[in-house]
Regions:
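Helix-turn-helix repeat elements of alpha-solenoid scaffolds
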Residues: 83-97, 122-137, 166-179, 210-219, ...
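Residue register of alpha-helical TPR repeats
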Residues: 73, 112, 151, 189, ...
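Amphipathic alpha-helical segments of tetratricopeptide repeats
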Residues: 95-102, 135-143, 174-185, 219-230, ...
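DNA major-groove recognition helix of helix-turn-helix/homeodomain DNA-binding modules
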Residues: 45-60
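Short alpha-helical DNA-recognition segment
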Residues: 15-34
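A short, Lys/Arg-rich alpha-helix, primarily the initiator
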Residues: 1-14
Length: 287
């Protein structure tokens, strides 16, 4: 019942419908209010009529796997690549075009754009407080079951780490790990999100000079990538081990990690990281 009430209320607000407008010609406004408070279970016939007005299938209210087609699909694909490359200039350019172009957006799509804006604010304009506040507000208004919640929480965690709020970062990291334990990793977005969280944590451990723990975290995440047959974040994880390994591993071992990462960058056409790896190899050979 809680799922029905929450999804019903969120979808109505997403479409900017008042309770009265939604109820008009179908039922009493008081019934809409009771549904949203979880005090009334509508009949199948009533729910069907309301679902038509809300433009969703009937299963939407009960099945958390049901997704409504996004109007930002192309933008999301492009922005994902730009975020991986840390190309915030092009990300901002595409964001501005999308904001001007988009008219009707679902709540999740609007929240996605807010999430992107917080990243642009943080990295492009050094508006760290505003970006953090924006993400904190996002987390208050969307369900923790949604993909955008996980993205926003992970980004907020990174921001906390970068501004020195270590306790907040570690609390968020623990929360993220708990949430991901409930997700189905057959869903690529959940798998990639989980890998990102673990990579970020390994990077955080490096910043704290906990190199052994960082290597262990990276190795475990690499094993996950192999189990799931994905190369996502594999090159950065190998580079991280190589960088940490200068403290503990032999020169040839470190070199092998860099070379493996370099080959992946060539295969998947990642010139920015490839350039970094070539520099690491030159520095290593000069030692």
């Amino acid at each position: 019942m809680n799922t029905l009430a929450e999804k019903f209320r969120l979808k109505r607000k997403e479409l900017r419908l008042s309770q009265q407008t939604l109820a008009e010609g179908i039922c009493e406004q008081s019934q809409i209010s009771k549904i949203e408070r979880g005090h009334f279970i509508p009949s199948a016939d009533l729910l069907f009529k309301l679902s038509q007005r809300l433009e969703v299938p009937l299963d939407y209210f009960f099945n958390e796997q049901i997704e409504i087609k996004s109007n930002l699909s192309n933008f999301k694909q492009l922005s994902a690549r730009l975020l991986d490359d840390r190309n915030y200039d092009n990300l901002e350019y595409l964001y501005k075009i999308e904001v001007e172009r988009s008219t009707f957006l679902t709540l999740e799509d609007r929240t996605y754009l807010e999430w992107i804006k917080s990243i642009i604010d943080f990295y492009q304009y050094d508006s760290k407080c505003e970006a953090i506040s924006s993400l904190e507000n996002i987390l208050l208004k969307v369900s923790s079951n949604t993909l955008i919640y996980l993205k926003a929480l992970n980004t907020l965690s990174n921001f906390y780490s970068l501004v020195g709020l270590e306790q907040e970062y570690e609390a968020n990291y623990s929360h993220l790990m708990e949430l991901y334990q409930t997700k189905n990793f057959e869903h690529q977005e959940f798998l990639f999100g989980y890998i990102r969280v673990r990579y970020n944590y390994a990077h955080y451990l490096v910043s704290k000079e906990k190199y052994n723990e960082a290597i262990q975290e990276a190795l475990e995440t690499i094993e996950l990538c192999k189990e799931r047959q994905t190369s996502y974040q594999l090159a950065p994880l190998l580079v991280l081990i190589g960088n940490c390994g200068t403290q503990f591993l032999g020169k040839e071992q470190v070199k092998n990690y860099y070379i493996e990462a370099r080959e992946l960058c060539k295969i998947y056409n990642n010139p920015l990281m490839l350039m970094k790896i070539e520099n690491y190899l030159k520095e290593l050979d000069a030692v």
